[in-house]
Amino acid sequence: MTRPVVCTSPDSSAYDILAKLNSTHFSGLPVVEDHVVMGIVSEKDILQLVLQGKNLKTTPVSEFMTRDVVTADQDCAILPLLKAFIDNQVLRLPVTHQGKLVGIVTRHDLLKLIIDSTPEFPVIS
């Protein structure tokens, strides 16, 4: 899990988010207000705005963010977490504790955890 989380607010413009994604090399960010996850925004969302001819500097994230965000509780075990990633076809999951954002876990984080926790098996030659 990564913390602190780089996030954005619902009133941020699409342009500001694009700049933040570019500077952090992230592909998406949680949209947060008072430490509560309100939505999530990704590069794909920004690209769709461009295709629609929207003005990135005046379009707030609240108009195009994904609102139905799947989150994980900070005490979630690895198998339910893996299932949430697969079932929901997401690249990242905000991690919460008592409804407040405390971190974020990505597919990369999950793969690293699996690699680090898998014992090496002897090679049969």
PLM feature spans:
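The conserved cystathionine-beta-synthase
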Residues: 7-25, 32, 71-89, 96, ...
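A glycine-centered beta-loop-beta connector
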Residues: 21-24, 29-44, 85, 93-109
